[in-house]
Amino acid sequence: MNVLGKNYNFIELLKYTLPTIMMMVLLSSYTIIDGMFVATLVGESALASINIIVPIFNIILSIGLMFSTGGTAIIGRLMGQNKNKEAREFLSLLYIIASIVCIIFSIIILVYSNDITRLLGADSILYKDALDYLITVGIFGFTLVFQCLANSLLVAAGKPTLGFILGIISGLTNIILDYIFISPNILNMGISGAGYATGIANSIPAITCTLYFIFNRKQTLYFFKPSTNIILIFKACYNGMSELVGQLSIAITTFMFNIILYYFALNDGIKAITIILYIQMLQQAIFTGYNLGVAPIISYKYGEQNHDQLKSVISISLRFLSGISIIVIIISIVFSKELTMLFLSVDSSAFSLSVRGLSIISLSYIFMSYNLFISNLFTSLSNGHISALLAISRSLIFMVICLIVLPYSIGIDGVWLAPVIAELFGCILSYYIYNKFRYVYNY
C-alpha cells in the first residue's frame, strides 16, 4: 500500500512530517550561519546589502513554491485516485516548465542587475555589495526553484527522510564553502562568496532529486513521457497561487520595511530588520516544514474521499502547531538578546533596536502558524482561489495597511507591531473561511 494511504494518528503524523520539519529547520539554520559568516567576515553593512536583494530572492522562491506546492497537490490527488501513470506524466511536464521559467528569469536578472539594485533602494554604501549578491542570485536562482521541487516531491514520493538527508548535506556544504569563499585568509570573495556557496549547496538536493526520479523506477513516482495536458500546469500554478502571492507579498513588505526603517534609523534600521528576518526564517521553518510534510497526506486523503482521516489529520495539525507556536514565542522573547548576538555585538548601534523588534514581532507567531496551515490546507484541497485569498490578505493587504498606519501613529514600534496586527486580522479571516468550507470538504 502507498505510504500515504495508511491511517495517521498523532505519532504516525509526527513521524512522517518530522524529517521535513528538520530539513526546513536545518536549511534555515544554514542560512543563518551564512548570515553570520557575512556579518563577521565581511561586515554588518554587507548583511544589510543582502536584505536589499531579498525581494528578488523571494520572487524566485515564490516561483519554486508555486510549482512545488501546486504541483504536489495535483500529484497527491492523482495518486489518491490511483491514477499513477497520470501522476508520473505530470511530474515530467512540471520539471520541463519549471526549467523554462527559471532560464527566462535568470536572463532578466543578469541583464538588468544594475537597474534592479538601484530600484530596490541601495544607497552608495550598500550598492556594490548588493549588486554582487544579486548577480549570484541570477546565476544560481534555478537551484532554489528545484530545491523547492525536491523538498515537496520527495515527500509526495514517500521519501521525506531522503529529503532530510539531502538537506543536511546541502547545509554542511554551504557552511564549508562559506568559510572557503568568504574568509580573507583563503579565497576572500566577499559577499559574492556567500552567494556562490549557497547556490552550489542548493544544487545538491536539486540534482540528486532529479537523478532519483530519472533512475528509481521501482517507486510510484518517476520521470515518464511528459503529459501534453498543459492545462494541468495552469491548474498547478493556480493551486500554488497562495505560495506565490505569499512570497511576492514578503518581497513587497521587505522593501517597505527597508524604506520605513531607513527613514527612522538609517542603515541601523535595515540591519535590525535583516537580523529579525533571519531569526524569523528559522522559527517559521518549523511551520513551513510541517505544512510541506502534511500536504501530500491531506491531498491523498481528499483524493480517496477518506473524510474521517481528513478530519483527524487537520485536527491533530491545528493542535500541534498551536503548541509549537507558543513555545517559539517564549523562546524568542526570553532569548531575544542571545539570538541577536549571533549577528551583532552588544555594542553595535543596531543591537538594542534588533532586540526590541524581535521581542514584539515574535508575538505574531501564534496567529501566523494558524494562517499558514489554513492556507496550505486549501492548497492541498486544490482550492487555489481561497488559498491565494488568504495569503494575499494576511501577508500583503493587512500588512501594507499596518505598515502605513502604525509607524505614522506610534513611531518605530509601529513597524514591529505591524506583523502582529496583520497576522491577527489574517487569523480572523482564516477562521471564518475554514468554518465556511467545513461542510464543502467534510473536514
Regions from the PLM with identified roles:
Residues 15-34, 136, 170, 201-205, ...:
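Transmembrane helical elements of multi-pass membrane transporters/channels
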Residues 5-42, 55-70, 74, 99-106, ...:
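N-terminal transmembrane alpha-helices
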